[in-house]
Regions:
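Short, small/polar residue-rich loop motifs at catalytic or cofactor-binding pockets
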Residues: 39-40, 101-102
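Bacterial N-terminal signal peptides
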Residues: 5-16
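SH3-family beta-barrel domains
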Residues: 19-35, 45-49, 54-97, 104-132, ...
């Protein structure tokens, strides 16, 4: 009886789980986002370093993805890496000197600015922009 209970538990565990989507980020200074898998497809928009994406599928050397706004596009796999990044999702975000609202604001950024994750402390993320600016941001302000 214990074996059947255990087997049932294992089957439920492995068949009901949701697969985690692979998350990547842009590694080049600027990357073209295209409408399909190839340079013959239209450029939809351009993104900068550390722009995070969620992989939907792969086709040869091309990756179909979704971004923080739900937009989909294609990017060549040579232009991405697995570094952990975030992007701001609020219109105005304070970047602080330390992990907490008791720390001074170093600068503010608008929605859609990508950052490399350097460290985490509870609900705070230490970030670095491609231009070298660093600071701390609350996790509720990023995707």
């Amino acid at each position: 009886m214990r074996f059947i209970s255990f087997l049932t538990f294992v089957i439920i565990l492995f068949t009901s789980g949701v697969a985690m989507a692979e998350r990547l980020s842009v590694s080049s200074k600027i990357a073209n986002i295209r409408s399909g898998p190839g340079t013959d497809h239209e450029i939809l928009w351009k993104v900068e370093s550390y722009y995070p994406i969620v992989v939907l599928k792969k086709s040869g050397a091309w990756i179909n993805f979704r971004d923080f706004e739900g937009d989909e596009g294609w990017i060549h796999r040579s232009l991405v890496h697995k570094k952990a990044t975030v992007i701001t999702i609020k219109n105005t975000c304070n970047v602080r000197k330390g992990p907490g609202t008791n720390h001074d604001v170093l600068f503010t950024v608008e929605k859609g600015i990508p950052f490399l994750i350097m460290d985490r402390q509870k609900n705070w993320i230490q970030i670095k922009h491609a231009d070298g600016d660093r600071g701390w941001i609350h996790k509720s302000l990023v995707w």
